From Swiss-Prot:
<dbReference type="GO" id="GO:0005737">
    <property type="term" value="C:cytoplasm"/>
</dbReference>
<dbReference type="InterPro" id="IPR006169">
    <property type="entry name" value="GTP1_OBG_dom"/>
</dbReference>
<dbReference type="GO" id="GO:0000287">
    <property type="term" value="F:magnesium ion binding"/>
</dbReference>
<comment type="subunit">
    <text>Monomer.</text>
</comment>
<keyword id="KW-0378">Hydrolase</keyword>
<comment type="similarity">
    <text>Belongs to the TRAFAC class OBG-HflX-like GTPase superfamily. OBG GTPase family.</text>
</comment>
<feature type="binding site">
    <location>
        <begin position="190"/>
        <end position="194"/>
    </location>
    <ligand>
        <name>GTP</name>
    </ligand>
</feature>
<dbReference type="GO" id="GO:0005525">
    <property type="term" value="F:GTP binding"/>
</dbReference>
<feature type="binding site">
    <location>
        <begin position="215"/>
        <end position="218"/>
    </location>
    <ligand>
        <name>GTP</name>
    </ligand>
</feature>
<feature type="binding site">
    <location>
        <position position="192"/>
    </location>
    <ligand>
        <name>Mg(2+)</name>
    </ligand>
</feature>
<feature type="domain" description="Obg">
    <location>
        <begin position="1"/>
        <end position="158"/>
    </location>
</feature>
<keyword id="KW-0460">Magnesium</keyword>
<dbReference type="GO" id="GO:0042254">
    <property type="term" value="P:ribosome biogenesis"/>
</dbReference>
<dbReference type="InterPro" id="IPR036726">
    <property type="entry name" value="GTP1_OBG_dom_sf"/>
</dbReference>
<feature type="binding site">
    <location>
        <begin position="315"/>
        <end position="317"/>
    </location>
    <ligand>
        <name>GTP</name>
    </ligand>
</feature>
<feature type="binding site">
    <location>
        <position position="172"/>
    </location>
    <ligand>
        <name>Mg(2+)</name>
    </ligand>
</feature>
<protein>
    <recommendedName>
        <fullName>GTPase Obg</fullName>
        <ecNumber>3.6.5.-</ecNumber>
    </recommendedName>
</protein>
Amino acid sequence: MFVDQITLELRAGKGGNGVVAWRKEKYLPKGGPYGGNGGNGGSILIETVTNMYSFEEYRNLRFLKADDGQAGASNNRTGRNGKDLVLKVPEGTLLRDAATGELIHDFTKDGERIVVCQGGRGGKGNVFFKTSTNRAPTKATPGKPGEIRLVELELKLIADIGLVGFPNAGKSTLFNTLARTEVKVGAYPFTTLHPSLGLVHQEGMLYQKTWIMADIPGIIEGASQNRGLGLDFLRHIERTRLLLFVIDISGIERHSPEQDLKILMGELLAYKEELKDKDMVIALNKIDQLLPDEREERVALLKQQFPDQEFILLSGLTGEGVDALYDLFKSKLSE
């Protein structure tokens, strides 16, 4: 199951108590303070890892707790520290305080690690309180409680290429062709119900460059107002380096390609206007369903209405135009 939002209560460990104890030697039944300090409670940390793409492993959890520190002991022994708890999250995770909405951290790189809840300090044993004027202190302190925090984790996928289009535009078929995967396809809306990730590289190339591609669930008119799958997955568009709009040029499933493109761009800009500055290419898909003259006519009309856009013709089903698309990826996504 794809889980890209979750709320968790995080509880760091409590510090162990300090103890009152005395040295016991022959002929010296109370030979001075000998009680040790408590161990520190375990902290809770969050760390990004590769090859993780959702919060699925946390979906049935409501809270997580680190270990408590152990109490001190006689012979001035310090209690064992509680073990830290490290939560693994995908790159692209936003960590927020659930109570205030404050952004705590934006995890964008592998290996980032921060402390979210600090473990409580261990209490002091009576050895700590020995002074020149108080040789036999009877005081010890309890351990401090660990921090408790209610947090929200939100994932915005980080991918090189994001496939965007209406349901049944052929995105999943094209995704399968490019990433050589088996994403479910079918002739009904919302075949793709959650983002799919795949690795794209050109077969037969001596020096291959691999890109991460995300197939975003189909967007419908009104998605920016949360219709259809709506805002659930529009967030994943924000971090892709290149947006690949997949338009059904055949016009068989829906209305005209020009109208599709106009509505699609309008929905994305209504969701977040800054998306207009993102690099984008329009993939005119299903050209195998048109005669050559029909292709030329429809492409000419699209270029006339969208003169600033870059178009590429292809068929995800037959593979026509796919090599040109690989070349485009190389030129657009080169370091």
